[in-house]
Regions:
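A general structural motif
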Residues: 11-13, 41, 96-97
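A structured beta-alpha segment of the ubiquitous adenosine-cofactor-binding alpha/beta core
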Residues: 63-110
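A general structural signal for stabilizing positions within well-ordered secondary structure
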Residues: 18, 35-36, 91, 95
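Glycine-rich phosphate-binding loop and adjoining beta1-alpha1-beta2 segment
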Residues: 37-80
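A short, gly/pro- and small-residue-rich
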Residues: 113-118
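Short glycine/serine/threonine-rich phosphate/pyrophosphate-binding segments
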Residues: 24-28, 107-112
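Glycine-rich adenosine-cofactor-binding loop
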Residues: 14-32
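A short, basic/flexible loop-to-alpha-helix module at the beginning of a structural domain
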Residues: 1-14, 90-91
Length: 118
């Protein structure tokens, strides 16, 4: 039986966090999952801010491709009610990430608020 890798940082782990699942984020997450071995990525994490019923299939598809769902702590239960199983909350995902790719319109604002602290 193959041992499951942890999502938390280690000396040799490489975790990529993609923020946003829109026009840019969704295909990027899929591409990173497809090229994980070639790019030496251990985990592709993706953050989804809002649980939307019409995006359940999109989130499930990304998880099926091997991506790890990350949500805000205050939305965790809302995602679970929709049938999702988030594996991390945003605070832990940011600390585990070696690379953060923000695909949201608020990316520049997030840089000042979140990423400069990293």
């Amino acid at each position: 039986m193959r041992r499951r890798k942890t999502i938390f940082p280690g000396p040799n782990s490489k975790n990529v966090l993609v923020i946003g699942t829109g026009t840019i984020g969704e295909p990027l997450i899929g591409l990173l999952c497809k090229l994980k071995k070639d790019l030496l990525i251990d985990n592709v994490l993706f953050h989804k801010r809002t649980p939307l019923d019409y995006e359940v299939a999109k989130v499930n598809s990304l998880v099926d491709k091997g991506a790890v769902l990350v949500v805000d702590e205050d939305r965790l239960e809302d995602f679970k009610k929709m049938g999702h199983s988030p594996r991390l909350v945003m605070k832990k995902a940011l600390s585990a990430a070696d690379v953060v790719i923000d695909c949201t319109p608020a990316g520049n604002d997030n840089k000042a608020k979140l990423y400069n602290k990293m």
